[in-house]
């Protein structure tokens, strides 16, 4: 009887295609979330949609750090661009090298988005910079920040949202909504990047073995 050739248990090309497809999906999601972070941070810099607060330095510290622009914005977009440009690479060795680069990009995006998320949570807990009444008159400060004798209860006490800050108008609601959006979007970025690290490392580990795992021809 003629020799019967066995079918490969799994194909390296199939693995490459699957990993590359996941990379492109993550890239699209990261670009979308980076756009959300950028818009949210720009709005945080413009209370009441007026630029004079920014020019006078009367903007919440965590918003002025602009992590939504450069950390969860520009840096993540650079990484996402690399994911979107991922192509089918012939040869398992070349594929594993590409996956190592993508893993490094994923780690960088993970760190930058996690940093933005941490800054956003801090800004949310600390409260906004605003003009408020003191015993010596009106002054700029952060009246809602937690102190030794007071916790961060302003988030759960809406009566403080309109009764403490005089300017910018509605700045408490403004910051709560936008910092929540910024923190949530950057947190999702961090989760996607963490999953992408696992995805690319699996590609590195399994890339070669998937190509070598074949059934030898069996002679009758």
Predicted regions and their residues:
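Intrinsically disordered cytoplasmic terminal tails of membrane proteins
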Residues: 1-14, 92-95, 143, 149, ...
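Short, flexible/disordered secondary-structure transition segments
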Residues: 37, 43, 50-53, 128-132, ...
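Cytoplasm-facing ends of alpha-helical transmembrane segments in multi-pass membrane proteins
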Residues: 38-45, 71-91, 109-124, 154-160, ...
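Disulfide- and glycan-decorated extracellular loop modules of small multi-pass membrane proteins
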Residues: 58-61, 94-95, 104-181
């Amino acid at each position: 009887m003629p020799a019967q050739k066995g079918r490969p248990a799994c194909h390296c090309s199939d693995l490459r295609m699957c990993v590359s497809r996941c990379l492109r999906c993550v890239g699209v999601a990261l670009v979308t979330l980076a756009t959300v972070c950028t818009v949210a941070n720009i709005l945080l810099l413009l209370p009441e949609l007026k630029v004079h607060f920014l020019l006078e330095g009367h903007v919440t510290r965590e918003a002025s750090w602009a992590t939504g622009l450069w950390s969860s914005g520009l840096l993540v977009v650079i990484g996402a661009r690399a994911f979107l440009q991922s192509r089918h690479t012939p040869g398992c060795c070349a594929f594993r090298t590409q996956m190592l680069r993508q893993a490094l990009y994923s780690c960088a995006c993970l760190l930058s988005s996690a940093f933005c998320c941490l800054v956003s949570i801090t800004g949310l807990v600390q409260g906004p910079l605003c003009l408020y009444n003191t015993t010596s008159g009106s002054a700029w400060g952060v009246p809602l920040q937690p102190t030794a004798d007071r916790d961060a209860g302003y988030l759960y006490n809406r009566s403080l949202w309109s009764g403490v800050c005089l300017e910018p108008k509605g700045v408490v609601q403004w910051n709560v909504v936008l910092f929540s959006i910024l923190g949530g979007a950057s947190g999702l970025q961090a989760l996607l990047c963490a999953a992408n690290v696992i995805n690319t490392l699996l590609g590195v580990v399994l890339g070669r073995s998937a190509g070598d795992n074949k059934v030898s021809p069996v002679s009758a």
